[in-house]
């Protein structure tokens, strides 16, 4: 069986079993004002800042509101409050004003001087796929099984008493893979959360950031930009896994594959955030290629993977004359600029925990390893955990390594020493020991395992059966 991973795209197993899945679109046809769901960001005035917003400082709270978070109801999490903040941030550079929304969840047992930045994977260019929308009670994606698994992991963080902030780190255009937008929006979400007076958080609160896969784009770039963009923040650690650190390498790695929709979405995100890229790509792309880009702007991840399989970015169906536009002099320098580790001045200044499966079939291991080496040469303090077992793929690494991510958060919050310099560790697979985290979290991990079955791996039939019995495309 072809290896299939990534929590959000396990639906590919069902595709192989049934031959096809009909796409249930998450696109514009859902954006009706009379919808029973919470209003789409397209129609929700909360997402639009008032005049003069661009004259404020990054991290300024422009608007706030209370919300109900759907998964906290199903997981029976006792929250003290759930808020959304519209805040000022920056775009592709710090001279380009932008804005975004972050969702703040405060558990009853919250500690006043601790904050966890959770960077969710979105991997789409459609605003209705942003965390701030799909988290809301009654949102179309709120009960999607794929969404549920990631939220089970967030539950672990909340159960530990950490206030969390979950930004729409792709910005108002949902510009997937536009690295600096991801990083700026993540750092400014921290600022906005600390600035939100109702929370009464200590401005010097210890902060740990965590992100996997598409969320690791945000995490890696937030770590890179912290030392130059948000020096006042007391970030004490970054956890990033399955990291797409090299945009170009990821595009090539996924090109023409079952997961090529991610490449198309990445191209769309860069096209939408860099006018010069938009102009050039617009001149060489075919109508079918343009339709593929537009598809990613109107659908969420599940539909993108199903609808855009085996797309070749340099093929005749996507680009005129089968031109490799990624190497063009008008685009290649920008893609290089968006690669983690190419600028030594952007080396992370606080501890970094990276983890990656050697046989990751979605995000290339070698590229993440290269970034780790570059950061270490720049003086980073970094632990790189490699999993070499053949059973370890993209999804199994995220799920099974969760206890060690949470242990990293705990250690950083408690002020434990981190290694001085860099270390590479290699194991077949994570040591599955929920007891590391305390008995009260066992139920959370059992919920994750029960969803997938007792084993999680590249040939797991139990996962396949779970997918077949659920609708893994968005509604």
From Swiss-Prot:
Transmembrane segments: none annotated. Keywords: Disulfide bond, Glycoprotein, Hydrolase, Lipid degradation, Lipid metabolism, Signal, Virulence. It comes from Malassezia globosa (strain ATCC MYA-4612 / CBS 7966). InterPro entries: AB_hydrolase_fold, Lipase_secreted. Secreted lipase involved in Dandruff and seborrheic dermatitis (D/SD) probably via lipase-mediated breakdown of sebaceous lipids and release of irritating free fatty acids. Has triacylglycerol lipase activity and is able to hydrolyze triolein. Mostly converts monoolein to di- and triolein, while free fatty acids are only produced in low amounts. It comes from the Eukaryota. This is Secreted triacylglycerol lipase LIP5. Residues 1-19 form the signal peptide.
